[in-house]
Structure formats: C-alpha cells, structure tokens
C-alpha cells in the first residue's frame, strides 16, 4: 500500500537525517523536502502495483528522483543564463528535457492517466504564539535595504539598559592591604624618580645601573640645626605666651584695690620715665632687637592659681 511505503520512506528518511529532529529552519526545510519526495516515490510504487517496499529501495528511488529534478533545474538555469536572463522559463525546461532524452509529447497523456493518485498537501501546523509579557513601545520596521523575509527586530524593551556600579569594599583587612600596597607603590615610584633625576650610587662597580641607590647629600651647614629652636621649645614658648595672656585677662577682670602707697610708687615711676624717655625707648628697642630665642632672658613658668570665691 501507499501508506506502508510512505511509512517506510519516512522511517528511512528519519534514519538518514538523524534520530533527533533539528530545530534549525534550514534542516527542517530539507527534511520536509525529503519526506515529500518519499511520498511521491511511494505513490509511484503503488500505481505500479507494489504493496510494500523495503527501506533501502525507497531511499534509492528517492535519491534518483532528487538527482533527476536537481539536474533539470541546473540545466534550465544554465540555459537561462546563456541567453542573458535571470529566471528560467518553460522553454528552458523543455530544452533541458529534450537534451536529457525525455519525450516531451508523452507528458499530456501521462498527466491524464486514469490510475493517477492525488497527493494531498501536508497539514500546516502553525507554532503557538506565546503572548508577550512585556511590551514597551513599538517594534521597529525594516529599513528599505533589508528584505521583508528577514526576522523582525527585537522588542524595544531588549534595548533598555541599567548601568551597574560596584559596591565599595568595606572589609577592614582588604582596606589595610590595599592601603599598604598603594603606599608601597608610591614609595617605589618616588625612589625610582629620585634615582633617575638625581645623583645615584651603585653597590657594584662594574654595572652602575643594576641596583642604583640615592646618593646621600651632607648638609652644607651641619651646626644650623643646633641653633634653630626645636618643636618642643616652640611649644613651650607658645604655652608660656598663652599663660601670660590668661593671667592678663584675669587681672583685668579682678577689681582693682590700690593702696595709697602703691599709687605713690607708680606716680614716681611715671615721673622718672617722663624725665628720662630714653630708658623706655632703650627697653623697647632691646625687646624688639633680640629675636634669637637663645639670647632671650630666661622666663620661669608661672603657676596658675585658682580663683577663690569670696
């Protein structure tokens, strides 16, 4: 029967194309074409009176039919291109059949035969359309230079991008290691810069550039550091100055109790200074001239006394 032959042909094509069906559209097209040829071969065998056929026989006849049709198409295309045309016509196919030794006059009688079997078209199964869960905007149409059979552009939501940022590292150990490596890199870069720009010394006499060392520069005036005040002395001087200012503010805030004897002594001092203005000028001059801290008179630290509530 034709159904048995078609089943055998379909099974043979399955073994030929592979046990698993491919999801590639090109592979699906070749598989569908192969099955169509097997159905045609099965119908021809049924018309010839065969009830069943072996798998190898169906495959051989399918290959012969496919080769015959391919040769007709190739020859028709070559005749078409020979006459400076791009698409073959019926005359090209007729010339091809004549060149292949086929009698074209027998085609109408063969098409009108009484035992001809009508092959129905295979059912077209449309793939289920999955609803789009997310739609943002409208799809872009194809530009004029892109053919319409090409796939459509992706949905607009696929072009949406969200920039990502790396979270800052908050681990204490990692931060310490990173700070130590940065400090080490800075020190190495600084020493290399000093070695390239300044004078260097080498541990090896033969090769000077192998292990350069920064040359030690002696001070031009070595005793200058002994004459300059240190940080401790400057801090002590600032503390004494601040204590004097505090005492001065305390004396300004306290009520003045001046005895008559003290007032008389102050009047005498002011009268002496008025008679000899050179004394006050010399004192002010000495204080302004003496700028070296080692030549200044020694100042004992004053003890701050707490105010008594009376």
From Swiss-Prot:
Biased composition, class Acidic residues, residue ranges: 236-250
GO biological process, one term: transcription initiation at RNA polymerase II promoter
Record's keyword terms, sorted: Acetylation, Cytoplasm, Developmental protein, Differentiation, Nucleus, Phosphoprotein, Transcription, Transcription regulation
Phosphoserine PTM positions: 271
Compositionally skewed regions (Polar residues) per UniProt: 270-283
Domain of life: Eukaryota
Stored SMART domains: BTP (SM00576)
An annotated GO cellular component: cytoplasm
Family label: Belongs to the TAF8 family.
Assembly, per entry: Component of the TFIID basal transcription factor complex, composed of TATA-box-binding protein TBP, and a number of TBP-associated factors (TAFs), including TAF1, TAF2, TAF3, TAF4, TAF5, TAF6, TAF7, TAF8, TAF9, TAF10, TAF11, TAF12 and TAF13. Interacts with TBP, TAF1, TAF6, TAF10, TAF11 and TAF13. Component also of a small TAF complex (SMAT) containing TAF8, TAF10 and SUPT7L. Forms a heterodimer with TAF10. Interaction with TAF10 is mediated mainly via its histone fold domain while interaction with SUPT7L is via its C-terminal region.
Name the UniProt record assigns to this protein: Transcription initiation factor TFIID subunit 8
């Amino acid at each position: 029967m034709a159904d048995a032959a078609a089943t055998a042909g379909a099974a043979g094509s399955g073994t030929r194309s592979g046990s698993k069906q491919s999801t590639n559209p090109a592979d699906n097209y070749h598989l569908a074409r192969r099955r169509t040829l097997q159905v045609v071969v099965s119908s021809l065998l049924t018309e010839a009176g065969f009830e069943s056929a072996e798998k190898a026989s169906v495959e051989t006849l399918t290959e012969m039919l496919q080769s015959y049709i391919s040769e007709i198409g190739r020859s028709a295309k070559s005749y078409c291109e020979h006459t400076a045309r791009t698409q073959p016509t019926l005359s090209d196919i007729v010339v091809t059949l004549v060149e292949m030794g086929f009698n074209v006059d027998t085609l109408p009688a063969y098409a009108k035969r009484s035992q001809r079997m009508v092959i129905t078209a295979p059912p077209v199964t449309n793939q289920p359309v999955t609803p789009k869960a997310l739609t943002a905007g409208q799809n872009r149409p194809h530009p004029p230079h892109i053919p319409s059979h090409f796939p459509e552009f992706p949905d607009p939501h696929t072009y949406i991008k969200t920039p990502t940022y790396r979270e800052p590292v908050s681990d204490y150990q990692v931060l310490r290691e990173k700070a130590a490596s940065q400090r080490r890199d800075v020190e190495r870069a600084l020493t290399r810069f000093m070695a390239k720009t300044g004078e260097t010394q080498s541990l090896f006499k033969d090769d000077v550039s192998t292990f350069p060392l920064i040359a030690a520069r002696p001070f031009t005036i070595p005793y200058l550091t002994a004459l300059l005040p240190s940080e401790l002395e400057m801090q002590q001087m600032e503390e004494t100055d601040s204590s004097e200012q505090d005492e001065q503010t305390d004396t300004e805030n306290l009520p003045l109790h001046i005895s008559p004897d003290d007032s008389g002594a102050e009047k005498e001092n002011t009268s002496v200074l008025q008679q000899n203005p050179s004394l006050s000028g010399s004192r002010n001059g000495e204080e302004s001239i003496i700028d070296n801290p080692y030549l200044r008179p020694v100042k004992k630290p004053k003890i701050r006394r707490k105010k008594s509530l009376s």
